């Protein structure tokens, strides 16, 4: 009976494991520390130690959890880890089973950004050989950005000023927040499903790294790279950069610069047309002058080598052949006159003046037609723009405020349900003409399910 009080190693280890499993404080543990002894075998699991200056904790992260982290862990990296404490019975030790990991500190996003940039650059997503040439004269431009930001106003204003005939199709999307990257990818896909879009602008106004982060997401960068429609990326201000800038066909410093790259200025085209017209007239005038000089040379040649001079020499030589020479001279004069008339007729026939006048008339008609078409299209686009502005004003949340509704915020976040509030919470209510601040003193939820 004395032997019954002794436990096996497996039994005591199992007992300790059960203690960890039932301890509520061990089921979800948040740990901050430095990674060391990092190993990743072919299985895809991560084995490492989390340490600080006083202790260390053996840890493991299984493959499914590893696939969900957005960066590559490295030795010496400070991290924040969520997981549970358990017992590895075969080794007889407790260890940390990590379920989520993210870099710790201000530079966390920069680390993730640089690692993703290096990965995509190795895959060739930023190669110059892949970039497409922007069309010289697009007729339709798609814009993927927020419908309420300054970026869309700058793009629309610039395009309509430079080339009023170009149709601009705006694909409104959220440009920051949890689902912003997904919405941007969806809109890029919709644009590529069409066959009439010549060039696409994606972007937003300036902001912090976190606010611009959607354009650093891997799905967005790959969607820009895979787009069959040429893409101009215009994210933030001139000093801001996003990974979509590198995978796009062209990077613009600002949304306004993107619009200038997308369409030419019709005034520049008019100047180029006028310049070509001037060059055509200059070449024609030079050709006419050369023909006139050639004609003068022919006249001088005819005077110096004409039959009259030959006849005078024959008369001085002998009177005997006077009559015969007169007859011969008359025949030769008639022949030369006929030839001269033929040459003169041919010269008039091939004279370029009539062709020049015809070309000038056609050029004037085409210019007049082009001006009428541009004015007509400008008027049509202005009418469409006015209707769109009226529709946007009708859908504006400010219209709801004018009808007596209010919008409630808690700590700067929109309150969508009474479940978002607790008794004692401070709230702000935006109403027509201003806002009020209040505190929740009572709460009653709607049990009807509405």
From Swiss-Prot:
GO molecular function per UniProt: exodeoxyribonuclease VII activity; nucleic acid binding
Enzyme Commission no: 3.1.11.6
Catalytic activity field: Exonucleolytic cleavage in either 5'- to 3'- or 3'- to 5'-direction to yield nucleoside 5'-phosphates
InterPro entries, A to Z: Exonuc_VII_L, Exonuc_VII_lsu_C, OB-fold_nuc-bd_dom
Entry keyword annotation includes Cytoplasm: yes
Keyword list, A-Z: Cytoplasm, Exonuclease, Hydrolase, Nuclease
Compartments (UniProt record): Cytoplasm
Pfam families documented for this protein: Exonuc_VII_L, tRNA_anti_2
Main location: cytoplasm
GO cellular component: cytoplasm; exodeoxyribonuclease VII complex
GO biological process: DNA catabolic process
Family, per entry: Belongs to the XseA family.
Function according to Swiss-Prot or TrEMBL: Bidirectionally degrades single-stranded DNA into large acid-insoluble oligonucleotides, which are then degraded further into small acid-soluble oligonucleotides.
Subunit record text: Heterooligomer composed of large and small subunits.
Name by which UniProt lists this protein: Exodeoxyribonuclease 7 large subunit
């Amino acid at each position: 009976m004395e032997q019954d009080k002794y436990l096996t190693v497996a039994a005591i280890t199992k007992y300790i494991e059960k203690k960890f499993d039932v301890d509520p404080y061990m089921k979800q543990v948040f740990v901050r520390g430095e990674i060391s002894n990092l190993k990743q075998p072919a299985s895809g699991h991560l084995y490492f130690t989390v340490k600080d200056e006083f202790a260390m904790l053996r840890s493991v992260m299984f493959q499914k959890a590893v696939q969900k982290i957005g960066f590559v862990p490295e030795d010496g990296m400070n991290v924040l880890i969520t997981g549970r404490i358990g017992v590895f019975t075969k080794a007889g030790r407790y260890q940390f089973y990590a379920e989520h990991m993210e870099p710790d500190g201000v530079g966390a996003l920069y680390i993730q950004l640089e690692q993703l940039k290096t990965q995509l650059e190795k895959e060739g997503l930023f190669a110059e050989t892949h970039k497409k040439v922007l069309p010289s004269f697009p007729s339709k431009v798609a814009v993927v950005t927020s419908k309420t930001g300054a970026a869309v106003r700058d793009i629309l204003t610039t395009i309509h000023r430079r080339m009023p005939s170009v149709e601009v199709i705006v694909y409104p999307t959220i440009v920051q927040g949890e689902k912003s990257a997904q919405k941007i990818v969806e809109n890029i896909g919709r644009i590529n499903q069409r066959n009439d879009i010549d060039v696409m602008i994606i972007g937003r106004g300036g902001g912090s790294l976190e606010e611009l982060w959607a354009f650093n997401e891997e799905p967005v960068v790959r969607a820009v790279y895979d787009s069959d429609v040429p893409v101009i990326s215009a994210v933030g201000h001139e000093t801001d950069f996003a990974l979509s800038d590198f995978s796009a066909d062209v990077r613009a410093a600002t949304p306004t610069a993107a619009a200038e790259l997308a369409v030419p200025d019709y005034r520049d085209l008019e100047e180029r047309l006028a310049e070509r017209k001037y060059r055509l007239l200059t070449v024609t005038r030079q050709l006419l002058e050369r023909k006139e000089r050639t004609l003068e040379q022919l006249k001088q040649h005819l005077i110096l080598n004409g039959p009259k001079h030959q006849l005078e020499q024959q008369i001085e030589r002998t009177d005997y052949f006077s009559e015969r020479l007169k007859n011969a001279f008359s025949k030769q004069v008639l022949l030369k006159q006929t030839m001269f008339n033929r040459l003169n007729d041919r010269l008039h026939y091939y004279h370029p003046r009539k062709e020049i006048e015809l070309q000038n008339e056609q050029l004037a008609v085409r210019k007049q037609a082009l001006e009428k078409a541009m004015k007509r299209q400008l008027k049509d686009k202005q009418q469409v723009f006015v209707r769109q502005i009226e529709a946007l004003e009708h859908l504006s949340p400010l219209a709801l405020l004018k009808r007596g509704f209010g919008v409630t915020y808690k700590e700067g976040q929109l309150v969508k349900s009474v479940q978002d509030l607790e008794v004692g919470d401070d709230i702000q209510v935006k109403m027509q003409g201003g806002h009020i601040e209040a505190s929740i003193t009572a709460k009653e939820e709607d049990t009807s399910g509405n």
